[in-house]
Regions:
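Acidic/His- and Gly-rich active-site-bordering loop/insert found
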Residues: 2-115, 135-140
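Buried hydrophobic positions in well-ordered alpha/beta secondary-structure cores of metabolic enzymes
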Residues: 33, 74, 87-90, 127, ...
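Conserved strand-to-helix beginnings and helix N-cap segments that scaffold or border functional pockets
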Residues: 42, 99, 124, 156-160, ...
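Glycine/serine-rich anion-binding loops at beta->alpha junctions
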Residues: 95, 111-126, 205
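Small-molecule pocket liners
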Residues: 103, 193-196
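Acidic/histidine-rich catalytic neighborhood of metal-dependent amide-processing enzymes
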Residues: 120-194
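Acidic-enriched catalytic cores of C-N bond-cleaving enzymes acting on peptides and small amides
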Residues: 187, 206-210
């Protein structure tokens, strides 16, 4: 078995010291209402991530989107021209605006609670700290690209093209959605479909004779 290099050990040691900072970032993200149709809220999540990237000296750009949350792309260079590794995540949630006021972020008995605390604001924190760690210590053989979109919960109608374009350039991609209760991770999906169904029938009562 190949032993990790010393810089990787340093990287992991640093991550071990960042738990409080991770929880702080998670708290800040969860305490922003960011329903898929709340563009202002979804973009405020990007603003908070942008503050983190500025603190870590990680360059990022905004991809303007008119109707839903803007796209956000952060890059940690390296890899001598190798194809990048893509770290994906979405900033929107299914919860209505105002949900944060009802149940803001809190930690009870070692568990975090709040809107988006599973799907998927912790995943944004994971990706952000992965980028920060490799930006700080290096050792990555490929460039790293963090892509943070704003409309996944409604099928990514405005960010789909952005995701596809980044995925085509990447060597591989990790999407930091939550795993299963067993600890297993999901490696593929069957896909999804939106459809409109017209149902025709005859009105009746179950107790009637028809």
């Amino acid at each position: 078995m190949t032993q990790p290099s010393s810089n990787k050990l340093t990287l992991l040691d640093w991550l071990d010291t960042q738990e409080d900072n991770m929880v702080t970032l998670l708290r800040d993200l969860v305490n922003i209402d960011s329903n898929s149709f709340d563009k202002a809220g979804v973009d405020r999540v990007a603003d908070r991530l942008g503050e983190f990237f500025d603190e870590q000296s990680i360059p990022f750009e905004t991809i303007p989107i008119a109707t839903h949350g803007d796209g956000m792309r952060a890059v940690v260079a390296g890899g001598n021209g190798n194809r990048p590794i893509l770290l994906c995540g979405h900033r929107d949630t299914v919860f209505p605006t105002g949900e944060v006021e009802k149940r803001p972020f809190e930690v009870r008995d070692g568990k975090a609670y709040g809107p988006g605390v599973a799907d998927m604001k912790p995943g944004l924190v994971i990706n952000a700290f992965i980028l920060a760690a490799f930006n700080k210590f290096g050792g990555h053989p490929n460039p790293l690209v963090g892509l943070f979109t704003g409309d996944e919960e409604i099928g990514s109608p405005t960010s789909q093209d952005v995701i596809i374009a980044e995925a085509k350039k990447a060597r591989l991609a990790f999407n930091s959605e939550p795993g299963r209760p067993s600890g297993n991770i999901v490696t593929k999906r069957k896909g999804g479909i939106f459809c409109h169904c017209d149902i025709y029938g005859v009105a009746a009562h179950s107790g009637g004779f028809f």
